[in-house]
Each structure stands twice: as C-alpha cells, then as structure tokens.
UniProtKB/Swiss-Prot annotation:
Pfam families with a match to the protein in the record: PD40, TolB_N
Name assigned to this protein: Tol-Pal system protein TolB
Keywords tagged on the record: Cell cycle, Cell division, Periplasm, Signal
Record function comment: Part of the Tol-Pal system, which plays a role in outer membrane invagination during cell division and is important for maintaining outer membrane integrity.
Gene symbol of the encoding locus: tolB
Compartments it resides in: Periplasm
InterPro entries tied to this protein: 6-blade_b-propeller_TolB-like, PD40, Tol-Pal_TolB, TolB_N
GO biological process, one term: protein import
SUPFAM superfamilies listed in its UniProt record: TolB, N-terminal domain, Tricorn protease N-terminal domain
Amino acid sequence: MKRLNLWAASLLLMLCAGMAHAELTIEITKGSDQAIPIAIVPMANGDDLPENVSRIVSNDLERSGRFEPLPRESLISRPSSSEEVHYQDWQQLDSDYLVVGKIDNQGGEYRIQYELLNVNGQNRMLGEVVTSSRDQLRDSAHYISDQIFEEITGIRGAFSTSIAYVTASGVGDDIDYALSVADADGHNSQQILSSDEPILSPAWSPDGGKLAYVSFETGRPGIYVQNLATGQRVRLTSFEGINGAPAWSPDGRKLAMSLSKDGQPEIYVMDIASRDLRRLTQSDAIDTEPEWAPNGRSLIFTSDRSGNPQIYRYDLGSGRAERLTFTGSYNSRGRFSPDGDAIFMVTRDDSGYHVARQDLDTDRMTILTDSDWDESPSVAPNGTMVIFATQEGTRGVLGAVSADGSASFRLPSPQGDVREPAWSPFLD
C-alpha cells in the first residue's frame, strides 16, 4: 500500500474495506517496566451488573502504562472495605496499592462505594461514594479511574474523555465513510456523520462541544463545524483547491487551516463569528497542518520549504516563522503537549514512519513507536498518551503510546479500516 502524504496534496485518504460503526477493542501491546503494581478487588455485588465497574477501572489503569493490575486469580481475598483488609497479605503480593469497594442497588440507582489504600503505608488515601444510574455505570467507572490515577500520580486522569475517528465500509470505488465519537477506551461509539465521500481531519473545539472536519460531500473539500449535542452543521469554507487541516484556537474563536485558494497551500486563520480570513504564511512551498500553541501566541505547521517536510513555528506577534525540526529528512503533523514544552509528530527513518517526541528546550527527538506506518498523532489532554493511526497487516487501526514510549496499546475495529484519530479535551 502506497503511503499518502497528507501534508502534500488535497488531504485525500483512501481507506480500505471496513465497518463504519463498530466499537474499538483495546489490545495491550507493551507494558512499562516501571508500572506500579496495584490490586483491584472485584467490588461486592458488582459481578451481575451490565457493566463490570472493577474490570473497567483495571483496564483503564493498565492501558495508561503507569499501572500493572494484579491478575484476578492471584488475589488471595476479596475485601469490600478497608476494615476487612489485612495489609500483610497484599504486601506478600508486592502490591503497592489496593482498591476495594461495593455496589448497592437502591431502587434502580446504584451506590458505588470505593476506597484506595496504600499497602505499605497501611492507610486509606481516598474514599468516595459515587451515585450512578444503570446507563452511567461505565462513565462512573471512568470517573473512579480518574480519581485513583490523579491521587497516585498527581496528574489529572483522562479516562472520561472521548476520541473521534474516521472509518469506512465497502470495497473499491463503493466506499461509505463515517465520522464517529467514542469513549477514550473505544466503547460507546456513536456515528455523527456518514458520507459516500471522504471525511478527514476531525478536530475538537476547546470546550469539547463541537468538531471541525473536512468533508468532500459536495465533490470538493470543505471545512465544516458540527455541534455534537444538536447535530447542527455549518460549512465554513469551500474555496477552489485545498480546504484542509482545521485547528481550533485555545479560546475557541478561531480556526487555523490550510487553503490553496491563492496558489500554493498556505496557513490561514479564520475568525469563526465574522468569517474574516487572515493569511499567515507567504511562501512558494506547501504549508499545512497548523496547530496552535497552548498559550495561543504561536502556531506550528508542516512545510516543505527546506526541500522536505519539516515542522516550523509561526509567531503571531512578529509574523516570523522558524524551523523546529532538524533530525531526519521527514517530520510532519506536529502536535503540542498540553504544557507546550514538547511536540509530537510523525518522523521517518530507514524503517518507516513513527510517532516521535521533541523537547522544545533541548531539541532532542525521541522515537516512541516501533511500527512502520504511523500517522495522525493526537495527544491526550493530560499529556500522558498519544493516539495515532497505523497499519496492522493490510488494515488501518488506531494505536496509542505513552509520552515516554514505555507502554502502548491498539484499538482495532472488529474489521475494516480506522483512521484520523483526535483526542478530546477534558469534558467537564
């Protein structure tokens, strides 16, 4: 399969045969050697519920790469509260932390009581009662995972966030495309748009309420914004040539994009309310894939003005662009870490295309993945993981890797091709 450079032309992406509306399932591919051992005891009264809260929490923490849940068969007892815990038993299992709890059904409303215990310190770190409806049990489990993750690591958990992605069904020239949104673990997939023309580059608004994307539904590319709550759609651009790579400003008032209406693809910024356009770059090269810095004062973008695709930074105050990447002959699709201290990108070496991280203070680049056909990285809002598209055999799947490369997992669809992932902001 020939690699298509999204930075180079009209952002056309031909997807292989697949399903347009299927939940993704997580497959852990690599665990971290520094993962923290934690025992998550099945919650009392929780086995017969439509969602296994304890198992969801265990899966969440494991795929973060920060934790290694003990296998259920190794648990020597099943306490449901801290009063029932014999800490020496769990010390023998080399577990640093212990999660216990119980679930009570109170007339169709579920009362989830959980505790996080420090095994070596023999003390309770966290305890809470969460009230949930039957339909919200999975959401409640993700919430509990977020609280445990933050209590131990000091980093806000991102298990209650969402991902957007593009799938396709059909073969040959008869392909149906779909834009879907799912929980960060691939469950609760909901299709928000279907089309017999390509859909590309989904991008979340800062408040998580809208998606911008590129659709070819009129026969040529246009940039659209869709309200996820109401389904209302607005077409913002449909110029001749390329209309691609929308990126929201941190305040949600502007979209950066790549347009070729004046010749070569250049970076523009649109004020969404007024539709006023401001052209930023002026070059004979291809400039595309803009991304706003978290502070809103600059953007990064991909350009081949040096002869090969590299990542540049455009300062909105001075109007100057500077090259950021010098390692290797191909670096594209730059994405900031939430703190703005690093960028994640696709880089090419002799073995293929990989997700990499570059520290902006030292300029040191680290390749994070060992797959050879990676593209479209998107960073979790807490900066701990990066989701991306890659190849598994002849199929496109989604992968994720920790920010330091120590842990990874895949989110393949049951069949078919999945592309263009975008991780949501925190959904408060």
